[in-house]
Every structure is written in C-alpha cells, then in structure tokens.
Amino acid sequence: MDTILVFSLIIASYDANKKDLRDSSCRLEQLPGIFPKDVRSIRELQMQETHTETKRTTFIQNRTIATLQCLGSDSKVKVNLVYLERRPKVKHILKNLRIIAAPRRNSSASSSCHLIPTSKFQTGSLLKGKAFLPGISQCKVLGASSETFPTTAPSITPGNKEGEKTTSTDTDENLEKRQKWSIVVKILIAVTLLLSGVAIIVFVIFEVPCPYQCLGARKLCQCQWLWRWQKKGGQPPGTAESKPDSQPQKVGQDAANSSNPKKAAEITVIHQTYF
C-alpha cells in the first residue's frame, strides 16, 4: 500500500514538474522616445533561477508570462524574457512584456530596479533577480494573468530554417486553477490511500478485533440475510443440513411406538406436557 501511495504521488506530480524553469534570463531593449533625453541605454537584466543552467538551441514557442512594472510613471520599454524548459531540446522565447518605468526622484542618487518575486509562474517557480536600470526604481514582477498580452514572433524549428509566425496568448489563470485542483486531487488520493492502508494493516495483518459497532453491524447484516431467505420461501443452509439428521430419530421413534403401545402413550404424554 505504501508503494502504491508513493508511485501515485510521483505520477501525479510529474505534470506539475515537467514545465519547471531551469534557466531564465531577461533582456531589456529601449524603445525610441520612451525615456528622457539623459537616459541613453538600458543595461542587460539577468534572472538566474536556483536550478542549474542548461543550454538549448531550439526555439519553439513565444508566450508572455509576467509584467515588469515600475511604479510612478507610464513609460514603457520592451522586455524579451527567455527561459528554458526541463523538457529536452525545448526553448521558449517570451517577448513584449510591458514595463511601467518610474523616473528618478533624486538625480544624484543611483537608481535600480529590483525584481520582487510577487507572482508565481505555472509550477510555482518564482522569477528572481535584480534589474539595475538608470532612471527607474521600485520595479516588481506582476503576473500576466491580470492582462492578456498576445504576442507574435518568428519561431524556428530544426527541420525548417524559415521563420514561421505563431500567435499565443497568456493562460496563467487557467494554469493556476489547474494547479489548485491538482493539489486538491493529490491530497484526496493521499488521504484515501493512507486510510485504506492503515485499515488493512490493523484489521488484516495484525488481526485486531473489530470494535462493538462493527460487530453490531455484522449481526444486522446476518439478520437481513435470514429475513431475505425466509421471504423467498427457502431455508438457510444451516437449517437444511439439520433436517436429514433428525429424520432417522423420527423413524426410530415410530418403530418404538408401534412395538409398545404403552411406551408410545407415555412418550406422547411427555411430548404433550413438554410442549
């Protein structure tokens, strides 16, 4: 039973772990006319996950997963968020994540944008890291479920060298709901298997006697079984077996009654007084 429980949990958690982030990087590109004149460039932003880095070369799909928002202004920049999946030879390119930039309040102070892990992506992995951006402060990562950002970008497969345009929309809300339901189902499966395993170990392996309520239920079941037999007009197997044993006694009694009338009368009186 414990083996079944372990394997069921492993199989149930496989779908949740197969899309885990292994290596993430975020690249910021400046759009013309967005920042003030004193801001000329944006440094590269790198977000490294706790997992080991892996290198993939196959570009498959484009999807928006998060919004990098900086409080205090409506300026926007273009964000290319690239992450690698655990699945073999699969790499996703995510583009057009919007940034709302906040200009510097104090020009002399050095400004930086910190990515606060406030939202979860699919399997619960948090986007972590720091963004050092001139003229921007108080930045945080927001889930793309609040808004849908349709993206269109070329995707290249190994068999086809030409770029093919694919359009994908964000489905973080559905993924979060699926995660919640999968967690509930896993808990129910684990509880059911655990209770059944404990019951089998206690009452079957160690042969612990049933409690009083269990014995009462067993008697009730036996009474219902006998009542059904009587209703059908038959007799239980136990009573049917006792009849052949009683027939020879009746034959012997009849022979004794025929040989001695007095004894037969006495026996008859005894039976009458007894009943």
Curated annotation (Swiss-Prot):
Principal subcellular localisation of the protein: membrane
* Localization per Swiss-Prot or TrEMBL: Membrane
Pfam families per UniProt: DUF4711
Encoding gene, per UniProt annotation: C17orf78
Q: Domain of life here? A: Eukaryota
Q: Which residues cross the membrane?
A: 187-207
Provide the protein name. Uncharacterized protein C17orf78
The keyword Membrane is annotated on this UniProt entry? yes
What membrane topology is given?
Single-pass membrane protein
Q: Which InterPro entries match?
A: DUF4711 (IPR031668)
Task: Give the UniProt keywords, A-Z.
Answer: Membrane, Transmembrane, Transmembrane helix
